Amino acid sequence: MNLNTLSPDPGSRPSRRRVGRGIGSGLGKTCGKGHKGQKSRAGGYHKINFEGGQMPIQRRLPKMGFKSRVGRTIDEVSLGELAKLNDEVIDLVALRKAGLINNSIKDVKVILSGELTAAIKLKGLRVTKGARSAIESLGGSIEE
């Protein structure tokens, strides 16, 4: 069985509506579109957002905000995650190797979350006040 060979059971689906095939079909001549008017013409119907000439809602409402591209290049790493690393110096390269951040991340901030048991040495990472005091209390160091 393949996806391209699947088909519904015979008789389970109604046949496609065939219009313009004589008055006996019930959909001959005007093909169920009535007489004249925009909706009876070929390609004739308004845009999905058309409100009869009234200013459409997406133009009445104000524009709001934007998506900051800064957030895509900065990431947070917790002390608990850093405690699992066995590197002497923890920097962006070490975090990428460990799979804690992806390649698009340009800057990392270490936050106070989780337990830190041993002294660690950070290089080139931002650190919160709480994380800084936790690292330095265990004898770790932070290089900017």
From Swiss-Prot:
GO molecular function annotation: rRNA binding; structural constituent of ribosome
Gene3D superfamilies in the cross-refs: 3.100.10.10
Region Disordered, residue ranges: 1-45
Keywords: Ribonucleoprotein, Ribosomal protein, RNA-binding, rRNA-binding
Family annotation (InterPro entries): Ribosomal_uL15, Ribosomal_uL15/eL18, Ribosomal_uL15/eL18_sf, Ribosomal_uL15_bac-type, Ribosomal_uL15_CS
One Pfam family linked to the record: Ribosomal_L27A
One GO CC annotation: cytosolic large ribosomal subunit
UniProt biased composition (Gly residues): 21-31
GO terms (BP aspect): translation
Function according to Swiss-Prot or TrEMBL: Binds to the 23S rRNA.
Subunit annotation: Part of the 50S ribosomal subunit.
HAMAP family documented for this protein: Ribosomal_uL15
PANTHER family: 50S RIBOSOMAL PROTEIN L15, LARGE RIBOSOMAL SUBUNIT PROTEIN UL15M
Family: Belongs to the universal ribosomal protein uL15 family.
Protein name: Large ribosomal subunit protein uL15
